[in-house]
Curated annotation (Swiss-Prot):
It comes from the Viruses. This is Nucleoprotein. Its main location: virion. It comes from Influenza A virus (strain A/Memphis/4/1973 H3N2). Late in virus-infected cells, may be cleaved from a 56-kDa protein to a 53-kDa protein by a cellular caspase. This cleavage might be a marker for the onset of apoptosis in infected cells or have a specific function in virus host interaction. Residues 8-21 have a biased composition (Basic and acidic residues). Keywords: Capsid protein, Helical capsid protein, Host nucleus, Host-virus interaction, Ribonucleoprotein, RNA-binding, Viral nucleoprotein, Viral penetration into host nucleus, Virion, Virus entry into host cell.
Length: 498
């Protein structure tokens, strides 16, 4: 497995990486959550939101987006240098929903970015608190991962749309730092690299001059991030080759596509963090809970406990099923878009359906949607059990998967066989040995052929009762192997468009 010793834990990435013990890490993650909560409370006061309106997930998303936009230095600079009609580069805002005379009304608010930054810093003891901002970015990314299937983006870069289990974090902004890089899937990194290579092929000056030098450094850094996700020597050696290329072109492109495919069986290590909407942290802080004092972890029982005691509401369109809307948000809160549905159903305690079977659109409401017919309902975000999140990719084995998705990327460390459609995946490799790295390719293909669908990953790991905070009694679930394992099955999911 990956050399765990040299890698920093997510919490260290989350906390600027000084080696800390568990208690310090928990306190420092708790401090970040406190800051988000305090900011949210203050914004609800500014916007004069009632308790119910403050717990509306759509309002939470608008407030989160406002602060992310206020701190987006590069975009702010760009907007000031390229003024566009009707856009004030110094202001940020969005739709806020209020209940007026028994109806939901949309109100567009506009704030000075400077004012939002002031409120954010004040909530974070005068700090910029970039980690809190990244945390919100990852929550938005997890929500996108559960809502949209990135078929078009995959096809545009020449990847198979069925490889969606590799696309975690594909909508994360570039500025999301180490914590953001940790949650990006192999496919996401491959896609970012391919975009660079394609630009280099089309634009002779892309790698040249002072700008080209910066581009080159970014390219090598992305290669190293991707290399660090792979867990076999052959995959890593291929990444070295891609990184060291003098002039990245078609050969590197082919190698990256090959590596992405190989990751369906020889899975990369991708972090999973439970990032919740600000409207969960706000009320908890308001009720007097001190996250810094109590400590908090994004990968253990804490998010489960928090969701167990939270009330979150959502606007519901006329033909949407509130239970399905709840499942969408539940999966996002648990960063589980690419986990096996059999396990998710077990943890949640109610059946979790593939995306195409859900009668619900995304959580955000477009500005042209009619508010007259909008209802609201409680999101059911509680779980029956809790489980420890994993970063390992759970490699040993595999099993049958579905037409819409041919592999999984586990989110929880629980004993199971990981479904994947070996014949479909291997078919992509037959006769494709041209290229310069045939020995590494042969080695990777050999390992993939050796992977057995029946083998079990995370042996002996189980889920836990919510009362079992110290994780002493693992319950190992047994699964019906005949059941569908993947979420983007068949594919009725909408596309994610920026």
């Amino acid at each position: 497995m990956a050399s765990q010793g040299t890698k920093r834990s997510y919490e260290q990435m989350e906390t600027d990486g000084e080696r800390q013990n568990a208690t310090e890490i928990r306190a420092s993650v708790g401090k970040m959550i406190d800051g988000i909560g305090r900011f949210y409370i203050q914004m609800c006061t500014e916007l004069k939101l009632s308790d119910y309106e403050g717990r509306l997930i759509q309002n939470s998303l608008t407030i989160e987006r406002m602060v992310l936009s206020a701190f987006d230095e590069r975009r702010n600079r760009y907007l000031e240098e390229h003024p566009s009609a009707g856009k004030d580069p110094k202001k940020t805002g969005g739709p806020i929903y209020k209940r007026v005379d028994g109806k939901w009304m949309r109100e567009l608010v506009l704030y000075d970015k400077e004012e939002i930054r002031r409120i954010w810093r004040q909530a974070n003891n005068g700090d910029d608190a970039t980690r809190g901002l990244t945390h919100m970015m990852i929550w938005h990314s997890n929500l996108n991962d559960t809502t949209y299937q990135r078929t078009r983006a995959l096809v545009r870069t020449g990847m198979d749309p069925r490889m969606c289990s590799l696309m975690q974090g594909s909508t994360l902004p570039r500025r999301s730092g180490a914590a953001g890089a940790a949650v990006k899937g192999v496919g996401t990194m491959v896609m970012e690299l391919i975009r660079m290579i394609k630009r280099g092929i089309n634009d002779r000056n892309f790698w040249r001059g002072e700008n080209g030098r910066k581009t080159r450094i970014a390219y090598e850094r992305m290669c190293n991030i991707l290399k660090g996700k792979f867990q076999t020597a052959a995959q890593r050696a291929m990444m070295d080759q891609v990184r060291e290329s003098r002039n990245p072109g078609n050969a590197e492109y082919e190698d990256l596509i090959f590596l992405a495919r190989s990751a369906l069986i020889l899975r990369g290590s991708v972090a999973h963090k439970s990032c919740l909407p600000a409207c969960v942290y706000g009320p908890a802080v308001a009720s007097g809970y001190d996250f810094e004092k109590e400590g908090y972890s994004l990968v253990g029982i804490d998010p489960f406990k928090l969701l167990q005691n939270s009330q979150v509401y959502s606007l519901i369109r006329p033909n949407e099923n509130p239970a399905h809307k709840s499942q969408l948000v539940w999966m996002a809160c648990n960063s589980a878009a690419f986990e096996d549905l059999r396990l998710l159903s077990f943890i949640r305690g109610t059946k979790v359906f593939p995306r195409g079977k859900l009668s619900t659109r995304g959580v955000q409401i477009a500005s042209n949607e009619n508010m007259d017919t909008m209802e609201s309902s409680t999101l059911e975000l509680r779980s029956r059990y809790w489980a420890i999140r994993t970063r390992s990719g759970g490699n040993t084995n595999q099993q049958r998967a579905s037409a819409g998705q041919i592999s999984v990327q586990p989110a929880f460390s629980v004993q199971k066989n990981l479904p994947f459609d070996k014949s479909t995946i291997m078919a992509a490799f037959t006769g494709n040995t041209e290229g310069r790295t045939s020995d590494m390719r042969a080695e990777i293909i050999r390992m993939m052929e050796g992977a057995k669908p029946e083998e079990v990953s995370f042996r002996g790991r189980g889920v836990f009762e919510l009362s079992d905070e110290k994780a002493t009694n693992p319950i190992v679930p047994s699964f019906d192997m005949s059941n569908e394992g993947s979420y983007f099955f068949g594919d009725n999911a909408e596309e994610y468009d920026n």
